[in-house]
Swiss-Prot record:
This is Queuine tRNA-ribosyltransferase. It comes from Solibacter usitatus (strain Ellin6076). It comes from the Bacteria. Coiled coil: none annotated. Substrate binds at D95, S96, G97, G98, F99, D149, Q197, G224. Belongs to the queuine tRNA-ribosyltransferase family. GO terms for biological process: queuosine biosynthetic process; tRNA wobble guanine modification; tRNA-guanine transglycosylation.
């Protein structure tokens, strides 16, 4: 019995785009879906009520590495799991921690059966293995767990990318075997997604995807994106990879993207995406609107009485002027981050809802052509 189920409700005959529903133990998720990032079990500046009730977020992403170091997976287990710990009623996807560990560079060492790393908090030594990261994420009670993978930097040689990809495949097999054994004793439902790697080499991506499909997991992720590569290359890699992944399973593009990129990935068969940009850029005064990007510190907004985005129905846009938002930002007020983050996440969610509606109504190609021009400033 699958740990989650996925059904496709509409497909675009002219692209690879599809609309679906992902069924999890913590509710149904309409796809394509954008997942806000709650690294430390919180989306900075927003409460869980803001996210679930006001914005309608159905799934969040949290970070295995950061929560493992603080407060620790055993404490989270003792507190009843991550859902109860952070008072979140809907689904949670946790990454494996691999991206963060491999970003540590001099603070980690790769072995065939895992990676040893030093905590960026206090220098303590830790080890992640394919099996241990599964156990950590099960302690969290995550609905969707990610397999430990190696995310190489960009660019790397074809030789190293192949070695890294083969290691990722071995880790995926080990993690999946352990996960299936753990599921025999678990009363709750969880799903495991392996991650396709291979840097920007399409032959390696295809080889990796083919090997991972043999595991017959509940879904598949495409990692190693947004690591400095040109956007056309990223889209090319996704297109080559997606062609091998089963149409009956959800596909997740990790760490993407800007507003103008979202429909491009959906057009290539992607169902799930996440990115820190809407919240991080919000805190830095970069706001996404239906008319393009607004850099709120610019002087032209000093006496602008209009809403941030006239087409947006979020609380920020219904209640405050651009002039007031600029005042908050220039004054360093915490309220700015709250209002800006709320708006940016709303904008991303609105884009995904527009995409889904376009797929179901049969107008996605027209939507894609329109959005490529209207959102180019935001991308």
């Amino acid at each position: 019995m699958p740990q989650i189920s996925f059904e496709v409700v509409a497909e675009c005959p002219h692209t690879r785009a599809r609309a679906g529903v992902l069924h999890t133990a913590h509710g149904d998720i309409e796809t394509p879906v954008f997942m806000p990032v709650g690294t430390q079990a919180t989306v900075k500046g927003l409460t869980q009520r803001d996210l679930a009730e006001d914005l309608g977020v159905k799934i969040l992403l949290s970070n295995t590495y950061h929560l493992y170091l603080r407060p620790g997976h055993e404490l989270i287990r003792q507190m009843g799991g991550l859902h109860k710990f952070m008072s979140w009623p809907n689904a949670i996807l946790t990454d494996s921690g691999g991206f963060q560990v491999f970003s540590l560079s001099g603070l980690r060492k790769i072995h065939e059966h895992g990676v040893v790393f030093q905590s960026h908090l206090n220098g303590d030594t830790h080890k992640f293995t394919p099996e241990s990261t599964v156990d950590v994420q099960l302690a969290y009670g995550s609905d969707i767990l990610m397999v430990l993978d190696e995310c190489p930097e960009y660019p790397v040689s074809h030789e190293y990318a192949r070695e890294s990809m083969q290691r990722t495949v071995r880790w995926a097999r080990e993690a999946n075997e352990h996960f299936l054994e753990r599921m025999k004793q678990m009363p709750t439902r969880h799903a495991l997604f392996p991650i396709v790697q291979g840097s920007m080499f399409t032959d390696l991506r295809r080889e990796c995807a083919t090997a991972l499909v043999d595991l017959d997991t509940d879904g598949y992720a495409i990692g190693g994106l947004s690591v400095g590569e040109p956007r056309p290359l990223s889209l090319e890699v996704v297109e080559a990879t997606e062609a091998i992944l089963p149409r009956t399973k959800p596909r997740y593009a990790m760490g993407v993207g800007m507003p103008a990129e979202l429909p491009e990935y959906v057009a290539r068969g992607i169902d799930m995406m996440d990115c820190v940009l809407p919240s991080r850029n919000a805190r830095n005064g970069y706001l996404f609107t239906s008319e393009g990007r607004v850099i709120i510190k610019h002087a032209r907004y000093k006496d602008d009485e209009g809403p941030l985005d006239p087409r947006c129905a979020c609380y920020t846009c219904k209640s405050y002027s651009r002039a007031y938002l600029r005042h908050l930002f220039q004054s360093g007020e915490i309220l700015f981050s709250v209002l800006a983050t709320r708006h940016n996440i709303q904008r991303y969610l609105d884009i995904m809802r527009e995409i889904r509606h376009a797929i179901i109504s049969g107008s996605f190609p027209d939507y894609l052509r329109c959005v490529q021009s209207s959102l180019h400033d935001a991308g």
